Amino acid sequence: KIEDLQKLLTWVEINYGFSLDNVLQELELELFTKKDTFYLIPVKYLDQFNGFPFSMLGMKLGKYSGDNFMLSHEFISRFGSKFENGIMTIDDEYLDHWMQGRDIRSLSDKTWQMGTIVVVKDSRSRILGGGKILSDRIRNLLPQRYVR
């Protein structure tokens, strides 16, 4: 639905200070939905192979989980350094803990609304993935395939 797509573009702009619309235009991508999941697919592919079935194509933007939209790890990794909002920097003492896929339980920053999905980076501004703000911790959203 066009109104849902526009709503998503606006949501990304408001929450992360990032123009997804500009990326779509500059990289010649189109938003494509499959169930509750959104993908960024090259326009050239759609122009030439629009009727072909697919199981995996393009970059996963994210998906709805209930009423919340969760950006994919791949999208955060690729574009998170360009975000202006929704970024949380973790102290170096938690870096190994985070990369092992564990949550950070000593959350001292209470400025985030519970349930917010943030881009997590380290003190050197390296993007580490996504995290979900909970009442007592930051839930690590790092996919298991990246846990070391």
Could you tell me what each predicted segment is?
Residues 1-148:
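Polybasic, low-complexity RNA-engagement segments
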